[in-house]
A protein has these predicted regions:
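Conserved core segment of the aminotransferase class I/II
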Residues: 49-50, 220, 224-296, 304, ...
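Conserved core of the PLP fold type I
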Residues: 60-187, 204-205, 212-217, 221, ...
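PLP-dependent enzyme catalytic core of the Aspartate aminotransferase-like
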Residues: 222, 341-350, 356-391
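N-terminal small-domain helix-loop-helix segment of the aminotransferase-like
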Residues: 2-95, 102, 280-281, 390-391
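Helix C-cap/helix->beta junction micro-motif
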Residues: 131, 191-192, 222, 346
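Conserved glycine-rich beta-strand-loop-beta hairpin in the small C-terminal domain of fold type I
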Residues: 278, 294-303, 315-328
Length: 391
């Protein structure tokens, strides 16, 4: 089957965070939404059909993850991550951010140090602080348009930390960390008593010619000292189903985490979380393959557009996902002026780079290009027009 990713669908008025909740963040709703990591493509038909079938049954009562659900998860893990997971090592989680919050509460106490690499997905910055932990930052190095880890700094910063939050693949840069990168992280963290929480939500959006490596697979040091989170939400554009999975191969870590969940009376998810995930993992592979081809074309289109029309914007092109990390500092304008132009002249909503790790990322913005190409072109045209006088 050939999927049409060029088709444009009206999403305004559907209580979409991306489309209908811009005013609290940008002061206006009159913007093109190129911010929240939510694609403007319909979910795979296999997912929609499975949900319709259950709705037609007429019963929407309490539901648990059955063997069919876990079988689909285990098969996907084996095929795509080379993980031989067992059901007892897995637990449903409503969302990875919530799952990480549970980790912070279960394994650390107020005042403990938690390590992150910046720039990084804003909840990695916010969760430790909001839970009364001390945030320690290891600043990534941007080299030849790609992020690299400063391992000397990581070694020093990890001492005294209780936990490291790892974005694998990296958000916002889209970097697919190499096996060697992950081995070194595992060795450093194991040596210094730092539990690694690996957020692998963008793993299945690793683009052709790149290979995702799941953290737990790189060494015994990694496998025995981590919690890995995976989700079909970004992959199949079903974030609203609140369906994620925690994978914990080490029994002592698993027992502590599961005991925390039990003490919190956290058990089962909503009915469509299981149905949607199982359908996606069982029948969504062809859709995903074509989606990734389309995303590659979108990335190439945006890259060419910047080079021809907006050469002062430097883009970090992703190896995974549909997010571009954009450096606007070439315009010589303050961060506030850049933001003002984007909102008031371009009327385009981009994620503010400062939220990814502080003022080191002033002048940077994250752009979501998981949309029909006509939408992408219009957004780029708007940005070009808004900055025409400072080119």
């Amino acid at each position: 089957m050939k999927y049409n990713f060029d088709e444009v669908f009206p999403r305004k008025g559907s209580a979409s965070v991306k489309h209908d909740l811009m005013k609290p963040f940008f002061g206006t709703e009159d913007l093109m939404p190129m911010w929240v990591a939510d694609m403007d493509f319909k979910a795979p038909e296999c997912v929609l059909d499975a949900i319709r079938k259950r709705c037609d049954q007429g019963f929407l009562g309490y539901t648990f993850g059955d063997d069919s659900y876990f079988g689909a998860v285990i098969d996907w893990f084996a095929k795509h991550y080379s993980i031989k997971a067992e059901k007892r090592e897995l637990h449903y989680i409503p969302g990875i951010v919530v799952g990480i919050a549970f980790c912070i509460q279960a394994f650390t106490k107020p005042g403990d140090k938690i390590l992150i690499n910046t720039p990084v997905y804003p909840p990695f910055v916010n969760l430790p602080i909001n839970n009364g932990r001390e945030l320690i930052t290891n600043k990534l190095i941007l080299k030849n348009g790609r992020f690299e880890i400063d391992f000397e700094d990581l070694e020093q910063k990890s001492k005294g930390c209780k936990m490291m939050l790892l974005s694998n693949p990296h958000n916002p840069g889209g970097t697919v960390w190499s096996r060697n990168d992950l081995v070194r992280i595992a060795e450093i963290c194991k040596r210094n008593g730092v539990l690694v929480i690996s957020d692998e939500i963008h793993a299945d959006l690793t683009l052709p010619n790149y290979k995702h490596t799941s953290f737990s697979t790189v060494s015994e040091s990694a496998k025995s000292n981590c919690i890995t989170f995976i989700a079909p939400s970004k992959t199949f554009n079903i974030a609203g189903l609140s369906s994620s999975i925690a994978y914990i191969p080490e029994k002592s870590i698993r027992d502590t985490y599961f005991e925390y969940l039990e003490a919190s009376e956290f058990a089962n998810g909503n009915i469509f979380a299981y149905i949607g995930a199982e359908a996606a993992f069982s029948g969504g592979e062809e859709w995903l393959s074509q989606l990734k081809d389309y995303l590659v074309e979108n990335i190439a289109f945006a890259d060419d557009y910047f080079k021809r029309n907006l050469p002062k914007i430097k883009a970090v092109l992703p190896e995974a996902s549909y997010l571009l990390w954009l450096d606007f500092n070439g315009f010589g304008l303050s961060h506030d002026e850049l933001q003002h132009r984007l909102i008031n002249k371009a009327k385009v909503a981009l994620n503010n780079g400062v939220t990814f790790g502080g003022n080191d990322y002033a002048g940077f913005f994250r752009m979501n290009i998981g949309c029909p190409r006509s939408i992408l072109k219009e957004a780029l045209d708007r940005i070009a027009n808004a900055f025409a006088d400072v080119r």
